[in-house]
């Protein structure tokens, strides 16, 4: 998903990032391998290459360890020549870490990564979920009189975004710009789906999923806290999983979660109790002060915690391009 033209175009159109690809293939020949990046220029977080910003993960597309090792070492040289502050990879495959470390890259941010196996029968998938926190909440939602609407219309996007702003406000964070979601819909088309649960006509919860080949991606979720007891979010997720399973999906990617985000981590653990570790790799090594999560970002988060909700939405449009 995160290698697709639609995703890269959305990053470019929303934040002005320049998509780049590095390959060992000669000019004017068919691409045999490659690593996708975005070139980011920011007065706040510096000039850098990230593979890829606002993407939970992005695997290098190489056919051999020799190809990958060559590209890693080339990027080290290019970083010095171009005066990039750092280069960042976000791979899933653990083999990458071994090669990267041998080439001088260092581990950076670490996350939990939840993936639900959908190759089992749907009934067996449901039985694998936490009985109290997922199964019973889904069953409760089915009796609660919720109405589900699916699609990517402007009306659905507006309702989703209202809930998204509310949710981000609860966590004292600015919302991702509205234009990001508009551009995602334009770039990804039918691969993107919004699902919203309504209670008596009021949006109660919403999710946004992406589909690429046999993988369904849970990218965004939002809710109105007044309706949490209804179990609307688990219900929406299960509906999305059921529909994806029927159309051939074999995996449900729930994305990354920071260790400190205990609420979200607990929620996802009820679906996938044994998450994997997701490690980002940087060259050169980033100090806490030097990284995008350093003191400038921490100070910004403190400021956001005191902002009115409308002002936070404006600040999101201003700051997100610096923190990809």
How would you label these PLM feature ranges?
Residues 21, 39, 100-125, 249-250, ...:
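Active-site/acyl-donor-binding loops of N-acyltransferases
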Residues 1-30, 34-46, 91-229:
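A conserved beta-strand-loop-helix scaffold within acyl/acetyltransferase catalytic domains
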Residues 21-29, 34, 40, 44, ...:
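Aromatic (often tryptophan-rich) hydrophobic motifs at membrane interfaces
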Residues 86-88, 147, 251:
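Residues at or immediately flanking beta-strands
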Residues 50-95:
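A gly/proline- and charged-residue-enriched helix-loop-helix capping module
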Residues 52, 128-137, 294-300:
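Short intrinsically disordered coil segments
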């Amino acid at each position: 998903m995160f290698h697709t033209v639609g995703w890269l175009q959305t990053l470019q159109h929303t934040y002005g990032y320049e998509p780049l690809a590095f390959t060992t293939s000669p000019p004017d020949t068919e691409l045999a391998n490659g690593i996708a990046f975005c070139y980011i220029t920011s007065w706040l977080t510096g000039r850098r290459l990230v593979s890829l910003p606002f993407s939970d993960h992005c695997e290098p597309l190489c056919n051999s360890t020799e190809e990958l090792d060559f590209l890693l070492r080339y990027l080290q040289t290019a970083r010095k020549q171009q005066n990039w502050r750092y280069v960042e990879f976000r791979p899933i495959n653990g083999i990458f870490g071994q090669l990267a470390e041998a080439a001088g890259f260092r581990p950076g941010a670490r996350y939990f990564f939840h993936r639900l196996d959908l190759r089992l029968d749907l009934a067996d998938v449901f039985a694998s979920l936490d009985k109290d926190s997922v199964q019973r909440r889904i069953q409760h939602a089915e009796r609660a009189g919720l109405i589900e609407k699916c699609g990517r219309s402007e009306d659905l996007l507006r309702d989703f975004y209202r809930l998204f702003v509310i949710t981000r406000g609860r966590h004292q964070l600015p919302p991702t710009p509205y234009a990001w979601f508009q551009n995602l819909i334009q770039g990804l088309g039918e691969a993107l789906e919004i699902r919203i649960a309504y209670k008596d006509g009021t949006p109660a919860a919403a999710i946004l999923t992406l589909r690429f080949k046999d993988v369904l991606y849970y990218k965004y979720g939002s809710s109105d806290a007044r309706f949490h007891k209804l179990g609307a979010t688990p219900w929406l997720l299960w509906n999305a999983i059921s529909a994806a399973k029927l159309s051939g999906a074999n995996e449900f990617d729930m994305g990354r979660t920071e260790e400190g985000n205990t609420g979200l981590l607990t929620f996802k653990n009820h679906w996938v109790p044994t998450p994997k570790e997701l490690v980002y790799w940087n060259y050169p090594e980033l100090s806490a002060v030097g990284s995008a999560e350093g003191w400038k970002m921490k100070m910004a988060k403190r400021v956001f915690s005191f902002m009115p909700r409308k002002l936070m939405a404006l600040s999101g449009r201003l700051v997100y391009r610096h923190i990809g």
